[in-house]
UniProtKB/Swiss-Prot annotation:
UniProt organism field: Dictyostelium discoideum
GO cellular component: membrane; SWI/SNF complex
All ranges on the Extracellular side of the membrane: 21-335
Chain segments annotated as transmembrane: 336-356
Protein name, UniProt field: Uncharacterized transmembrane protein DDB_G0281039
Segments in the Cytoplasmic topological domain: 357-375
Lineage of the organism: Eukaryota, Amoebozoa, Evosea, Eumycetozoa, Dictyostelia
Biased composition regions of type Polar residues, renumbered to the chain: 168-180
Keyword Lipid biosynthesis: no
Amino acid sequence: MKNKLFIILIIFIILKIVICQNTTPSKLIPQQQQKQKQQQTQPHHHHHHHQQHQQHQQQHQPNQQIKQQQQPQQQQLQQQQKQLEQQQQQQKIQQQQQPQQQLLQQQQHFPNSQNVIKTPPHHTQQRVPHHHGPNGAPHHHGPNGAPHHHGPNGAPHYHSPNAAPHSGHNTQGHVQTNHVNNINKNNINNNNNNNNNNNNNNNNNNNNNINDNKNIRNNIPSPATKDPNPFINNKPKVNSNTPQPFPHPPHNHNLVNGGRPVIHKQIPPHHHIPMGGGNIQSNQHFQGFQPSQVFTGSQPSSNSASPILFNSENPFYKEEYYKHPEKQVERKITPIMVLYILLASTMVIQLFIMVFKQVKHIREINAKTTMESLL
């Protein structure tokens, strides 16, 4: 917006200068006009020859000046070309070195990366981390609503295409490939077994989830991580096997289009608290489903905490996101913008006045000439 206004201002200034130079009325004295007419009718040959000689000298001098000016410009261009070539070579070297450095970092950060099951073919083969949200921040879900990470080397997780809740993340944040396809007890038990097999601590993931849910309000360290809950006092969970998590922008998952996540900007921030096999019990998350339809696996125990959604205990909760979605699009009018608008409007008015004056002046001259010709 500011750039456009600035460009418009520059155009107005140039137009004003051009109009001033081209349309300034030449108020010549009548005696000078007569002299000019006499000079036109009586040409002087000697004077004309002298003028030609002066013009020839003037034409010869700028050629020398142009040659002198062109030499340093050519040198500067050569230097710039050399610098560009050097920069391109450095960029090529950096691009070659980057993948090697990334591999080394991943191996140091995730020692157990070889044991992780690869993702299904509907994801990218390069195992690039996927991102949700307007500013491309990775989102994370954890066993009790805490942020978790997907895969040791950035493998994206996926959701089953038949609108089933996703599950199968173990305590280290590794993605399991056999997500729930049909909601029944056998599939949920299989997911739990896979979680237990891939868990380095050999803990029961289902029990850890329920214990973590119970400890949300008691601030007791969970048995899986021995850390206090990450959502108390907004302290993020730090685990030796996973990088430090951070909050994510509001997002939602579309479970119709092949289970791929799709962004809906007006959905408020949320997180998941899986219960009994890592399923999500939330009528607000899956619109059009009743909790009894969505959650048909092993029922949660009576001691487990209810999902924390849309309330003050959730640090990602913000009323503005879903009560006032128009606030996100609102643009503030800065004093600089007001100044630009004022300047532009004054320039437009000045241009109109100048054009009007010039037209009036031309009409007056035309009227005078016609009167003189009639007389």
